[in-house]
Amino acid sequence: MHMKAKITDVAQRANVSISTVSHVLNHTRFVSEETRKKVMDAVEELGYSPDASGRTFRTGKKMMIGLVVPDITNSVFASLIEDVDDVISKHGYNLVISNTRDCLKTEKQAVRNLASGVVDGIVIAPTSEDFQTIKQQMPDKFPMIFMDRVLSDRNYDSVIADCQEATAKMLREMIENGFRKIGFLVGVPWISSTYERVKIYRQIMEQYEIPESEQYIRYIDRQKDSYDEVGKLFAAGCTAIVATNTAMTHIVLNYVEDKNLKLGEEIVVGGFVDSDFANRFMYKIPVVYEPMEEMGKLAGEMIVEKIEDKNKKFSVKALLCEYDSNDFYRKQAAKYKGTGNTDSTQTKSTL
């Protein structure tokens, strides 16, 4: 019968002390990269698996971090899982994922379960509107980092994307190129990112004196509902639509393709994307880039630091989004004028 490898076997194979092996595996002291590699190679060769209960007893840590997301099918959060895991795994932590489906009851249960001794800390993209709702589910000073959304009653340790200026640029350019009836697809109304984007939309519409724009704001509870809402907006006379996440942007473009609409002539689409890779499949439309990879990695580093020092304060760290028109309007200028109005002023008044 094959004997299970012990820590002494790893130390002997790597030609280091048992304490060095322990420091490498538990991240309790600096060890040179050369020595760390020797230890990890020995662990791999011997198939050594540390005793988790013993490690918890010695260090007080489970070496597990929870990640609570509202929609695992959304590419933004799928990417977030990978980015957070990339960072925390280098510190010896494993990831436990909980998908809440934007359900507050599920979110409360997930936080309560994870914080009850399963994980050392949590990264969360919350469905809840306020901090107190989440705080009630976990012990005092439990390490937690909020992602993508901030809560109404407290600036807790958070990583967010600041898309206000990028969104404003996209909307201004649409209007200045003659598109005044702009449909605006956003997520559920009670989360901070939705609130901020709708706020910018209203400000720009007011600035350009487009009072009827309020009817073109559509709150999407389920991604699959986006398709039907695009049809309703197009039927209502919208000649431009902005989709404020990658999944919705894909759905809008699917609608355009299904209905054989001429992109740039009959309708213009502005999208939010989380990577340049995603943009390659979007006809080079105007886009707002959300720095999701950077946000995920930053959240990973922050939660590890928070676990190491529960009194550490970060407050809100905002990463700027970028707007890229992809030179769309210049390339499509002739087509825009071919919608039935050759005079640009006349076009602006009719679209």
Regions from the PLM with identified roles:
Residues 88-99, 206-223:
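Short beta-strand elements in bilobed, periplasmic/extracellular small-molecule ligand-binding domains
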